[in-house]
Amino acid sequence: MMNRVVLVGRLTKDPDLRYTPAGVAVATFTLAVNRTFTNQNGEREADFINCVVWRKPAENVANFLKKGSMAGVDGRVQTRNYEDNDGKRVFVTEVVAESVQFLEPKNNNVEGATSNNYQNKANYSNNNQTSSYRADTSQKSDSFASEGKPIDINEDDLPF
């Protein structure tokens, strides 16, 4: 069986950060995700998907994402239920995020958004490793940028 969700969208409001009685951080937010098709009027509609993220990633989401920030969410669908104050059973369907990626640079129009990604995965490596590679700042920052000259490539070298 598989339960996997990957979403890219914009936050509809600032994330809500709370702490459990045990002190565990939990953030909730709603992601507006455009549908791939248009309705009868030719307009693109959106789905509003509730998301929840736990622990340190929850604090990062609350600190760096704001209303309008673009984010990528990788997680699973969860359905839970509880009894409200009136004694009625309420069902909630949400995405439990295992990873939230901040998809806009810090200096973008959305205040507080960041391009740093936080992956909440056990197999995420390179956390404490140092690299011996040093960037040469005297070189151009984009080595693939075109200077307006045609690129000389032999078609036999292309993989397609």
Swiss-Prot record:
InterPro entries: NA-bd_OB-fold, Primosome_PriB/ssb, ssDNA-bd. Residues 130-144 have a biased composition (Polar residues). Residues 2-104 form the SSB domain. SUPFAM superfamilies: Nucleic acid-binding proteins (SSF50249). It holds the Pfam family SSB. One of its GO terms (biological process) is DNA repair. Keywords: DNA damage, DNA recombination, DNA repair, DNA replication, DNA-binding. Residues 107-160 are annotated as: Disordered. A motif (Important for interaction with partner proteins) lies at residues 155-160. Residues 115-129 have a biased composition (Low complexity). GO terms for molecular function: enzyme activator activity; single-stranded DNA binding. GO terms for cellular component: nucleoid. PANTHER family: SINGLE-STRANDED DNA-BINDING PROTEIN (PTHR10302:SF27). Plays an important role in DNA replication, recombination and repair. Binds to ssDNA and to an array of partner proteins to recruit them to their sites of action during DNA metabolism. Homotetramer. This is Single-stranded DNA-binding protein 2. It comes from Listeria monocytogenes serovar 1/2a (strain ATCC BAA-679 / EGD-e).
